[in-house]
Design a protein with these regions (language model features):
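Short amphipathic alpha-helical face segments that pack within enzyme cores
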Residues: 68, 125, 243-247
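Residue-level signal for inorganic ion chemistry
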Residues: 31, 62, 73, 114, ...
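An extended, acidic
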Residues: 172-249
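N-terminal subdomain of lithium-sensitive/metallo-dependent phosphomonoesterases centered on the IMPase/IPPase/PAP
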Residues: 1-111, 196-199
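DPxDG-like acidic metal-binding loop motif
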Residues: 99-163
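Acidic active-site catalytic centers that drive phospho-/nucleotidyl reactions
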Residues: 62, 87, 109-112, 116, ...
Length: 249
């Protein structure tokens, strides 16, 4: 597949991947600092607690990474002609029935798994997805605490790399029978409908993991086989699923 088929004109795949690595590991450093109550890098302020008039570590971390990603992408590629949409800016940008004015769209989730971030489980992630025509073509899923950066280009390749750039391939499990398949499910968003469905499927077992990014990573490592989320208020949104979908495809 040619580069022009998956990226905007004038955007080099290698240049883009280099910038995405820089932004991703920078985001990891920011989130890890906030998670530990330390001074974050890149000029961001240490979080004040809600009791002390601040927004708390979760909101501060979310907003800091949001700013880091938006400024990084717009600054590195000022002429790319894409639109940047994040979970934090969606309410301002999205008007019902009105399409966003660009063929290419970045969908960003600066902190996937806020509850796990707050609880200190380490199961949180950062998502970046480049979308064209309502379909993700490039996805990045960063797991800061695991030092894993999952990258996928639809129709090209998908892999995991660490901070040193060492790559590992996607390893889907070889389990085939329904009774052998392992489910990855939410630790905090479970209801009677999901429990009933899991019981009816009679799978081989299940694993509770926080954040969509961390759940999908267990599938990419071959630790689990499927993820089920039912419709409802807590169901994953576009910024939760776009990047993982690109890596899985």
């Amino acid at each position: 597949m040619s580069n022009s088929a998956i990226l905007p004109a004038g955007v080099s795949k290698e240049v883009l991947l280099t910038e995405l690595r820089r932004l991703s590991w920078g985001a990891a450093d920011i989130l890890r600092a906030y998670a530990r109550g330390e001074q974050p890098p890149h000029g961001f302020q240490k979080a004040l607690s809600v009791d002390n008039g601040g927004e708390g570590p979760v909101s501060a971390a979310d907003l800091a990474v949001n700013q880091w990603l938006l400024e990084g992408l717009s600054g590195a590629f000022p002429d790319a002609g894409w639109t940047l949409l994040s979970e934090e800016t969606a309410k301002e940008q999205l008007t019902e029935g009105e399409p966003l004015p660009a063929e290419w769209l970045w969908i960003l989730d600066p902190l996937d798994g806020t509850k796990d971030f707050l609880q200190g489980t380490g199961e949180y992630a950062v998502h970046l997805a480049l979308v064209r025509g309502n379909r993700p073509v490039l996805g990045v899923v960063l797991l800061p605490e695991a030092d894993e950066l999952w990258i996928g280009l639809v129709g090209d390749d998908a892999w995991c790399e660490d901070r040193e750039g060492k790559r590992s391939p996607v390893r889907f499990s070889e389990r085939k029978e329904l009774s052998d398949l392992l489910l990855v499910a939410s630790r905090s968003h479970r209801d009677d409908r999901l429990e009933t469905l899991i019981g009816e499927l009679q799978l081989g077992g299940s694993k509770a993991v926080g954040s969509v990014g961390c759940k999908v990573a267990t599938i990419l490592r071959g630790e689990t086989d499927l993820y089920i989320s039912l419709s409802g208020r807590s169901a994953p949104k576009d910024w939760d699923m776009a990047a993982p979908e690109a890596v899985l495809l």
